[in-house]
């Protein structure tokens, strides 16, 4: 905090006393109280540079980010040379996710003020947040030439390497940042490092970081406010209690955000207004799954708003999503506050989060409570831990009532399966094994999950299957070049001849589905199952064998199998999983019966019946809104039979 000389006039002394009170509160970490004191000082002396800067800092620390921006702008107007005010303004713009504005502002800074470490650090973040990763790395290198032991810059440079698919370089940057000391950011970086190491199939290093994650989470109080990388916890851990705590710790960061003002709406006979918020309304798995739901929403009963804060990739999928929406609202670059205010202005009855704690999420919007009922759905396979999310939309398999204690939200169970599917997805076309690089006479075990989902325990089972089935080959997806050599090393250590491994390149959806049908059995991963990949395999007519754990992410494939009438392929232990694969491998007739059933399922099974699914979802949305309109608090809404179409 700034130090000022004690003033002489009575009015100035009163302002100074308030400032001193604010400084004392800030030293205790009581930023909300500090802000009140600094604002009291400003009411007495509204043009004081020091009071403005201190108010901006306290507002930023207490999550009053819009106020922080206002105070920093006022401080700069009074003193354009204030370095502190400049970087407080940048920090506020970044927190508001106004990334393009942040970058433009930093590039407008005069050359003689661009020499410091703080400037290059801020510029690196702005470049990173606008997708300019190579330039961001160069900016962070400028920081490190000035201070090589800047832990945050090593970490942030790792993020840019990660986005460039250079996972091993990212890991080294994360590790360096941790060694140098990242303070309250350490847990988040342990999560990022564990995830990056799993993506590279460097399992010894990943296991070390996963243990660090668990140890830190276990040692924190439930009310701590830390960044936790929830997606890493949800996908790498099979412990639902641990996942809930990690998500709760993350949600605590939003505790002091004030709700936006909502205008009450007496709906009466008017349609229910449903809003979906996402950054993924383009060629993305979420849109691939949701497109037909948007097209089939009953416009006589629902007024649907799609709020997009992600990129427009000009794809056919983007055009399809826009055409399906009654209201498509473009909000890319808008702050959380601005998005929340727009949603509140639209008087949305039910707002649905399609991101959870994934990249480009806007949980800060939901923390502002722009809608009276808020739910999370599809994008994040686990609990948000957030008190401002009322419901998690699942089904009796992924969110069974017996697991309710593992979720902060109330359960909203669809009748069959939570995952929507698009009947307009490409149907498999004829393709030969030779064209896909597969032997005609082999039993092909297909493991097309991303590399991070392959755990050592699962690979042990797969290698055992190759030993037990001499004519089998293992068909894996070559997601990125850095994972393959490490996975091949793990296979070799387990005694597998690498000639029995086939690598599949990444393809477009139509070709991918066509080649998937060439396999004999899809073998799933644990503790994070195949999700869209599993429904693609079932659509292609391929039997899927899975192992269901105790978490949402480990039960998804089981839910999909239930929805196509193949629950017997969902096992409850790795031993049973292995035995099921062996039984199918030895029984070509059984595999053919399953294939025939799946071909029929494309047109008849609930998993692929988009009309039925949409009515089921709408019935659930109606139950949520009706409960609120009756003055009742959110409660578990368990599955009921899907409405007839």
Q: Across the structure, where does each feature detected by a protein language model lie?
A:
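Short hydrophobic signal-anchor/transmembrane segments that target glycosyltransferases
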Residues: 293-300, 456-470
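Alpha-helical solenoid repeat scaffolds of the TPR/TPR-like class and their adjacent stem/linker regions
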Residues: 1-439, 450, 489-496, 508-519, ...
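Short Ser/Thr-rich beta->loop micro-motif in glycosyltransferases that lines
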Residues: 355, 524-530, 548
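Donor-sugar nucleotide-binding helix/loop cap in glycosyltransferases
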Residues: 523, 537
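Short alpha-helix at the nucleotide-sugar/activated-sugar donor binding site of glycosyltransferases
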Residues: 538-539, 562
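Short acidic/histidine- and often glycine-rich active-site loop of Leloir-type glycosyltransferases
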Residues: 554-565, 570
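Glycosyltransferase donor-sugar binding loop
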Residues: 307-313, 473-486
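Short hydrophobic beta-strand element within catalytic cores of glycosyltransferases
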Residues: 543-552
């Amino acid at each position: 905090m700034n130090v000022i000389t004690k003033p002489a006039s009575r009015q100035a002394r009163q302002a100074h006393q308030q400032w001193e009170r604010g400084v004392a509160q800030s030293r205790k970490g009581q930023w909300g109280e500090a802000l009140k004191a600094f604002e009291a000082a400003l009411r007495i002396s509204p043009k004081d540079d020091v009071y403005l800067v201190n108010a901006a800092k306290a507002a930023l620390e207490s999550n009053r980010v819009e106020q922080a921006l206002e105070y920093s702008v006022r401080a700069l107007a009074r003193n354009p040379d204030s370095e502190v005010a400049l970087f407080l303004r940048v920090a506020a713009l970044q927190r508001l996710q106004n990334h393009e504005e942040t970058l433009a502002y930093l590039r407008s800074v005069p050359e003689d003020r661009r020499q410091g470490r703080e400037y290059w650090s801020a510029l690196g973040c702005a470049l990173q947040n606008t997708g300019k990763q190579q330039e961001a790395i160069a900016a962070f290198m400028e920081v490190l030439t000035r201070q090589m032991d800047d832990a945050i810059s090593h970490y942030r440079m790792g993020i840019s390497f990660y986005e460039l698919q250079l996972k091993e370089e990212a890991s080294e940057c994360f590790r360096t940042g941790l060694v140098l000391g990242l303070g309250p950011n350490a847990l988040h970086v342990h999560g990022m490092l564990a995830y990056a190491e799993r993506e590279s199939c460097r399992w010894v290093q990943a296991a070390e970081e996963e243990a660090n994650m668990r140890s830190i989470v276990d040692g924190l109080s439930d009310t701590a406010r830390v960044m936790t990388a929830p997606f890493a916890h949800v996908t790498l851990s099979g412990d639902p209690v641990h996942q809930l705590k990690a998500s709760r710790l993350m949600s605590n960061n939003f505790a002091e955000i004030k709700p936006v003002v909502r205008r009450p709406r007496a709906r009466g006979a008017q349609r229910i207004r449903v809003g979906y918020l996402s950054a993924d309304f383009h060629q993305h798995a979420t849109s691939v799954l949701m497109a037909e739901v948007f097209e089939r929403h009953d416009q006589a009963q629902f007024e649907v708003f799609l709020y997009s804060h992600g990129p427009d990739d000009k794809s056919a999928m983007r055009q399809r999503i826009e055409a399906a929406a009654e209201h498509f609202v473009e909000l890319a670059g808008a702050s959380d506050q601005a998005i929340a205010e727009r949603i509140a202005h639209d008087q949305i009855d039910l707002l649905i989060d399609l991101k959870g704690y994934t990249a480009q999420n806007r949980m800060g919007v939901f923390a502002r409570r722009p809608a009276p009922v808020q739910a999370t759905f599809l994008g994040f396979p686990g609990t948000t831990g957030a008190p401002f999310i009322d419901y998690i939309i699942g089904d009796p398999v992924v969110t069974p009532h017996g697991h309710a204690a593992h979720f902060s939200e109330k359960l909203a169970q669809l009748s069959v399966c939570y995952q929507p599917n698009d009947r307009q997805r490409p149907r498999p076309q004829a393709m030969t094994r030779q064209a896909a690089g597969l032997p005609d006479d082999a039993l092909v075990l297909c493991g097309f999950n991303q590399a991070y989902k392959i755990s050592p325990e699962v690979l042990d089972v797969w290698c055992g299957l190759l030993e037990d089935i001499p004519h089998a080959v293992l068909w894996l997806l070559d997601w990125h070049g850095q994972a393959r050599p490490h996975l091949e090393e793990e296979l070799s250590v387990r005694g597998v001849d690498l000639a029995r491994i086939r690598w599949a390149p990444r393809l477009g959806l139509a070709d991918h589905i066509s080649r998937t049908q060439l396999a004999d059995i899809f073998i799933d991963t644990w503790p994070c199952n195949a999700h869209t990949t599993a429904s693609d395999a079932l659509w292609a007519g391929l039997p899927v064998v899975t192992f269901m754990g105790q978490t949402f992410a480990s039960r998804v494939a089981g839910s999909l199998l239930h929805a196509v009438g193949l629950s017997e392929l969902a096992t409850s232990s790795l031993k049973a999983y292995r035995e099921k694969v062996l039984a199918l491998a030895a029984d070509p007739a059984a595999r053919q019966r399953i294939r025939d059933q799946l071909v029929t399922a494309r047109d008849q099974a609930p998993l692929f019946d988009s009309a039925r699914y949409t009515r089921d979802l709408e019935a659930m949305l109606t139950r949520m809104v009706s409960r609120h309109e009756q003055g009742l608090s959110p409660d578990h809404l368990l599955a009921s039979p899907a409405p007839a179409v």
